[in-house]
A protein has these predicted regions:
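Glycine-rich phosphate-binding loop used to anchor ATP phosphates in small-molecule kinases
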Residues: 54-104, 119
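P-loop (Walker A) phosphate-binding loop of NTP-binding proteins
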Residues: 10, 22
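Hydrophobic anchor at the beta1->P-loop junction of P-loop NTPases
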Residues: 7
Length: 148
């Protein structure tokens, strides 16, 4: 049986640290891929365009389909793209909605809370702490609306 478990949350809220710990314990984990895409697309602003979201969404769908028998952990999921599209005032493509409906993860989602004491910016983390809080709230809403 395949279990796909999501760990999500705003930027710099500890998701990747949790994923790294799970990897150390031998679990199959799928990394956050936004950083890689930000580097390749040379993005220098916290505003993400639809091309960025499309690229990230496709890679997250690929990761979903590449799950192995057993427990698989995901540093974010396809649903995160829906939250980011909403925040950036983009219309959510119908194909994104359909893929999210047809590719279900485990019903329990772990969402990390933004933590100002550990919050740092870098070349790929371009959102402010305030932005992180807005993203956190948007993520919660998207997952609730999707019945997680």
């Amino acid at each position: 049986m395949i279990k796909r478990i999501i760990i999500t949350g705003g930027p710099c809220s500890g998701k990747t640290s949790i994923i790294d710990g799970l990897k150390d314990e031998g679990y199959k984990c799928f990394n956050e891929i936004s950083r890689e895409v930000i580097q390749k697309m040379n993005i220098k602003t916290s505003y993400k365009n639809i091309d960025f979201e499309e690229t990230v969404f496709k890679k997250r769908k690929r990761d979903f389909l590449n799950a192995k028998i057993g427990v698989n952990f995901y540093d974010r999921s396809m649903l995160d793209n829906l939250a980011y599209l909403k925040i950036n005032n983009h219309e959510i493509p119908t194909k994104f909605k359909i893929d999210c409906e047809n590719h279900r993860y485990h019903p329990t989602v772990f969402i990390t809370t933004p933590w100002e004491d550990i919050y740092t910016l870098d070349d790929e983390r371009l959102e402010s702490f305030k932005d992180s809080m807005q993203i956190f709230e948007a993520l919660k809403q998207v997952y609730i609306e999707a019945n997680y």
